[in-house]
UniProtKB/Swiss-Prot annotation:
The gene is eif6. SUPFAM superfamilies: Pentein. InterPro entries: eIF6. The lineage of its organism: Archaea, Thermoproteota, Thermoprotei, Sulfolobales, Sulfolobaceae. Binds to the 50S ribosomal subunit and prevents its association with the 30S ribosomal subunit to form the 70S initiation complex. This is Translation initiation factor 6. Gene3D superfamilies: L-arginine/glycine Amidinotransferase, Chain A. It holds the Pfam family eIF-6. SMART domains: eIF6 (SM00654). GO terms for biological process: cytosolic ribosome assembly. Keywords: Initiation factor, Protein biosynthesis. GO terms for molecular function: ribosome binding; translation initiation factor activity.
Length: 223
């Protein structure tokens, strides 16, 4: 398991710019070669350089797992084609629901999903149909309803908001079928998604993440 620090466009909030699963990593266009190389070495994935809704904020707009990449309704045709042309062995679906910040409202791996609780029943049904998993429910983490912003879950492990209770951790572990721990990133931020990206091969954290935080992250994601 590789753990490395990264800065993107001069910020430690690296998670807002990148989506990854175990096969593909979507990054902004115009990212420098050195950064792309570090991402590729860490995640061991194929890199897709694009925008989403003409924005570099890939991690905010995209959600998904090893079976499907979910794109917001405001994505344009060229962006969809770019992703579909490369990510040929996963489904790529446009999610026609009101919110577009899918990375903030959907927390998922290949086994389960936790969804923003204020979605309508129709929107919930659309997400469930797109993910094609039964283990899906609405909820919050540490009283925060934008569940995607406070957690990162892979098919091996997960890290969530530091204030998550033991009872919540137990429920989350059962939902996602992986071990889950609590922690922080970037010198005390509990919004894990903003400063951490992970798949089964490695973890990248914002460069402000401290030694003790990295030790905790390492423990959470190690085999």
């Amino acid at each position: 398991m590789i753990i490395d620090k990264l800065t993107i466009f001069g910020t430690d909030n690296i998670g807002i710019y990148i989506f990854t699963n175990d096969k593909y990593t979507i990054v902004p266009k115009n990212l420098d070669v050195e950064t792309i190389q570090k991402i590729q070495e860490t995640f061991k994935t194929e890199i897709i350089q694009t925008t989403i809704a003409k924005s570099f904020l890939i991690g905010i707009f995209v959600a998904g797992n090893n079976n499907v990449i979910l794109l917001p309704r405001n994505v344009d045709d060229e962006e969809v084609k770019k992703i579909k042309d490369i990510a040929r062995d996963v489904r790529v679906e446009i999610l026609d629901i009101r919110p577009t910040a899918l990375g903030n409202i959907i927390l998922t791996n290949s086994y389960g999903a936790l969804i923003y609780p204020e979605l309508s029943s129709i929107e919930f049904k659309k997400i469930k149909e797109s993910l094609q998993i039964d283990n899906i429910e609405k909820g919050s983490i540490a009283n925060i309803i934008t569940v995607g912003s406070v957690g990162v879950i892979t098919d091996k492990a997960g890290l969530v908001h530091i204030d998550t209770t033991e009872e919540e951790l137990d429920k989350l572990s059962k939902l996602f079928r992986v071990k889950i721990d609590t922690g922080t990133v970037n010198f005390g931020s509990a919004f894990i998604h903003s400063g951490l990206i992970a798949n089964r091969n490695g973890v990248l954290v914002g460069s402000a993440t401290t030694g003790p935080e990295i030790l905790r992250i390492q423990r959470a994601f190690s085999d």
